[in-house]
Amino acid sequence: MQADLDEATKAELKRSELLLMDPSARRNRERVDALLSNNFVEIGSSGRVWTRQATLDLLATEITYTQPQIEDLAVRLLGPGVALLTYRTLRKSMSGEQTITLRSSIWILDSGSWKICFHQGTVAGKSMV
């Protein structure tokens, strides 16, 4: 097994993950559709489980999403054609409350393209800023 991903592949995976956090890209169904694997599942920070179709439907109509601050984005190879991305997001509400969420995504290499097959967000803390 390859010990690590090359820098170009890491950069591609990071770009793709960040694209899914970009408000304008999230509303572009074709763009998101191209990044989600057919069996994509998300466990949101609320604990709700989202299917691929539910995710596509939600993102197409999302109007209040603001891009969070992203920290500590790391990529690790799990096996041939399987990568894990981990990071944390910080999002500040209108009331000044900041939510820290730990996030992880599993990406698979499918017919030469990286696709996200799993994402989970877990709230790690809240504070007033």
Locations of regions flagged by a protein language model:
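A beta-strand edge to alpha-helix "cap/lid" segment located at domain peripheries
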Residues: Q2-A34, N39-V129
